[in-house]
């Protein structure tokens, strides 16, 4: 598996309006998916079989009642095992240089690759619980997120049908939001 990440422009999270962050996040997600597909084509031209993994939607599994989505594989965990970062209490992957402001992508390949070392830095201070304590929905519990509670506030659909990312406090309040 090849796992990679792109940085999300951090200025977008500090805008008073949620549209800049939603826009930046959507464009970066499309860019990550596009990069994955381009890499697949390059590798296939070299005779290597590939499978692109979507960096967001569509979900492999969706529970309507719990508002719980799961992808084909956990890109956060893939990023951790690829050495791209460590998992924070906010459940996001925290990269040493870019913090949690990254979008992760991956492709599966049918060749043996050399492993990168797993990151061994501290992503969250032991006593820090800013993200957990500040979550207006109380959706975080240090190891997972209650997606239903989170989605009730974070995903907002406008009258015109646009999906806006209204809450990202767990990302922005993190002292390591922009790097360690």
Give the positions of each predicted feature.
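Non-catalytic, usually N-terminal nucleic-acid engagement modules in DNA/RNA processing proteins
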Residues: 1-30
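Catalytic cores of enzyme domains
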Residues: 21-22, 27-180
């Amino acid at each position: 598996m090849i796992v990679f990440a792109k940085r999300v422009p951090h200025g977008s999270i500090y805008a008073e309006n949620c549209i800049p962050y939603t826009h930046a996040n959507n464009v970066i997600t499309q860019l990550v998916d596009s990069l994955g597909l381009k890499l697949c084509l390059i590798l296939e031209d070299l005779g290597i079989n590939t499978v692109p993994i979507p960096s967001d939607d569509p979900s492999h599994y969706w529970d309507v009642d719990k508002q719980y989505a799961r992808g084909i594989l956990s890109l956060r965990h893939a990023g951790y095992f690829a050495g791209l970062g460590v998992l924070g209490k906010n459940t996001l992957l925290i990269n040493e240089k870019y913090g949690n402001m990254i979008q992760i992508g991956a492709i599966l390949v049918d060749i043996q690759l050399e492993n990168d070392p797993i990151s061994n830095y501290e992503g969250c201070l032991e006593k820090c619980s800013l993200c957990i304590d500040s979550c207006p929905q109380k959706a975080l519990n240090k190891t997972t997120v209650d997606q239903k509670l989170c989605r009730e506030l974070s995903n907002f659909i406008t009258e015109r049908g646009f999906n806006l990312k209204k809450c990202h406090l767990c990302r922005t309040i993190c002292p390591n939001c922009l790097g360690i």
